[in-house]
Amino acid sequence: MLSEADRKNCADILMHAQKERKQAVQLSTTFPGIAIEDSYAISTEVANRKIAAGAKLIGHKVGLTSKAMQRSSMIDEPDFGFILDDQMIADGAKVKHADYCKPRVEVELAFVMGKRLMGPGVGLTDVLRATEYVVPAIEIVDARLQDQRKIFDTVADNGAAAGIALGGRPVGPLDIDLRWVGGIMYRNSEIEETGLAAGVLGHPALGVAWLANKLGNMGTALEPGHLVLAGSFSRVVFAQKGDTLHADFGALGGIAIQFV
């Protein structure tokens, strides 16, 4: 475990890396005693600093939702990060590549909460009843720490959350079987990745349930209007300057952004 001073130093490192768009040395290397509790405390510290500076908390993201990713990270559960309003990107937007260190994109579904949801004891049905609608999303992920990261680094770095674009057609959570929502990620008109939403813990709503229970253990709830990225169901696609990324969700429409 780290001291409070070391946790604040870690937050300083992450914020400096984001400001300078230059990856820092892994926190797990600089602070070998770091524990997962430290990592969540660090990500919370960074989020609180940004909120104090004027940003607004609008939701959360869930990561590491596939068994393969959990095994590679040597954990047995997902992780989460905070979504702030300054991370939102319009569908069709031109995004400055220079604003990121090494941006990548993922295909996801976003749940917008209609009712307050707080764990423990939240299950799939609870999530579906509390959700106002579900909408396609592209998440931009951007690690502020160098490669060979450990789970402690990923969690402290807010799950690499960097940007979110919503688009396509919103649907009610009970209108379709969300497991069968498919996503195709194109880069410059070529298919790079495909996936099914069932890849998120068997059902994307289970990613939201896990989050509600995790936050409930911390004394926090998902509030009405909050956005939850339930977890990626594709592998990441690296984005270079000049690339156009288009996520096709079939009957639910699509989203596109361009890095300039």
What are these regions (language model features)?
Residues 208-236:
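A conserved acidic, glycine/proline-rich C-terminal tail/linker
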Residues 192, 218, 249-250:
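Hydrophobic/basic alpha-helical segments enriched in Actinobacteria
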Residues 233-237, 251-254:
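Short, charged beta-turn/beta-strand-edge "cap" motif at the junction between a beta-strand
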Residues 2-203, 240, 244, 254-260:
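Catalytic-core "active-site belt" of small-molecule-metabolizing enzymes
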Residues 231-232, 249, 259:
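Active-site proximal loops enriched in glycine and acidic residues that flank catalytic Cys/His/Asp
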